[in-house]
């Protein structure tokens, strides 16, 4: 949509927006748990990944977060930025973003065609012909803005990758990112629904691969929440013993926690209540029992070694990681069409003149927190403006 709107700014251009589904913006309407984290004020400071992280720089600078928010304001969308830099629609509804874009598409030189699933693309001397079941569309220039494979239930597809590979472009390995992690830990189901703030470190054979601080949520299959999404990109990317080390009191040292727990040794309480008031009750009991200390044990009977073990459990608890959830659960696709085959200042193919690509289909993915949508807006607008220039 961003590319179509940008291209249509040239009144001499007729834009066809071809949508495979019955309506536009279905995936966008489901982002951010229905809130749509549409940008991040810190997007120019980093937070992007791919074989060439510098590729995204030009597009992001040309249409940075401030310009993006001003653009949406002109369209009629009121936004609010959190202290973290995450930007949301003031309505707190993702559909507000979809609707504003849908309204903007109502322009004389934009024709939206839904239920248009491309079966074939033919390269011709004067452009491209896209063939679908009911009709064909001919264009002088073609922008591939199909998104990635992530979120298959909402429309994630291989279509863009296949189309571009058909024109000779190469694609890196695709894998899910910003996704939940599965665990083989037998006690994980007992914590289903528990949320906690923690510092999480992704480990492979004991070596740190990634880390983040934020909210975690336990599920019946493993780990979820923003902090897990942040570290999930590299999970199980190679063979080895993968674990997630969790610090449930990142602002405390083990000694600080131990001093608090020692105060409870003068009571008649059992270890089931040792961490009450500090952590979620269910989480506290599981962390205590993981040391081998039973819940009915009197706190007064704990020795120094017992307290040290419990404190270490709270500060450095390790959960096995077997694999990330699949593409149907992922928010974003890591990997994509190789970027050195495109001009970063126009998003045009270096292989096929008149062919452009933008967004998730390329080998660019961002951190959790609005980075990926900012890349979509920035790269889409650059591709649209470039393709929409007078020929």
Sequence positions of predicted segments:
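Glycine-rich FAD pyrophosphate-binding loop
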Residues: 8-33
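An anion/pyrophosphate-binding glycine-rich loop and adjacent beta-alpha core
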Residues: 22-24, 29-30, 38-45, 170-175, ...
């Amino acid at each position: 949509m961003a590319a179509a709107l940008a291209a249509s700014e040239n009144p001499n251009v007729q834009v066809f927006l071809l949508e495979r589904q019955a309506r536009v913006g279905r995936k966008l309407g489901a982002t951010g748990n229905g809130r749509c984290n549409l940008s991040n004020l810190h997007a120019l400071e980093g937070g992007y990944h791919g074989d060439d992280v510098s590729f995204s720089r030009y597009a992001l600078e040309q249409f940075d977060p401030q310009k993006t928010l001003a653009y949406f304001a002109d369209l009629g969308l009121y936004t609010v930025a959190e202290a973290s830099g995450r930007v949301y629609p003031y309505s707190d509804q993702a559909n507000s973003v979809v609707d504003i874009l849908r309204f903007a598409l109502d322009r004389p030189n934009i024709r939206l065609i839904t239920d248009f699933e491309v079966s074939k693309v033919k390269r011709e001397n004067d452009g491209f012909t896209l063939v679908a079941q009911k009709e064909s569309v001919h264009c002088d220039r073609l922008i591939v803005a199909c998104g990635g494979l992530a979120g298959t239930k909402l429309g994630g597809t291989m279509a863009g990758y296949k189309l571009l590979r058909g024109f000779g472009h190469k694609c890196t390995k695709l894998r899910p990112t910003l996704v939940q992690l599965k665990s083989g830990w037998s006690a994980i189901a007992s914590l289903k629904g528990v949320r906690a703030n923690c510092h999480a470190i992704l480990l492979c054979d004991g070596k740190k691969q990634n880390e983040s601080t934020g909210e975690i949520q336990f599920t019946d299959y493993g780990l979820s929440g923003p902090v897990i999404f942040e570290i999930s990109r590299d999970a199980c990317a190679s063979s080895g013993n993968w674990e997630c080390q969790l610090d449930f009191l990142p602002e405390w040292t083990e000694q600080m926690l131990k001093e608090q727990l020692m105060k409870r040794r003068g009571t008649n309480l059992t270890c089931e209540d040792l961490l009450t008031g500090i952590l979620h009750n269910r989480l506290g009991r599981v962390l205590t029992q993981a040391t081998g200390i039973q819940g009915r044990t009197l706190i007064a009977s704990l020795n120094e070694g017992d307290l040290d073990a419990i404190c270490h459990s709270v500060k450095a608890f390790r959960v096995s990681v077997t694999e990330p959830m699949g593409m149907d659960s992922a928010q974003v696709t890591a990997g994509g069409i190789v970027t050195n085959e495109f001009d970063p200042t126009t998003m045009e193919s270096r292989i096929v003149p008149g062919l452009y690509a933008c967004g998730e289909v390329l080998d660019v993915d961002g951190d959790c927190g609005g980075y990926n949508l900012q890349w979509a807006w920035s790269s889409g607008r650059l591709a649209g403006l470039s393709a929409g220039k007078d020929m």
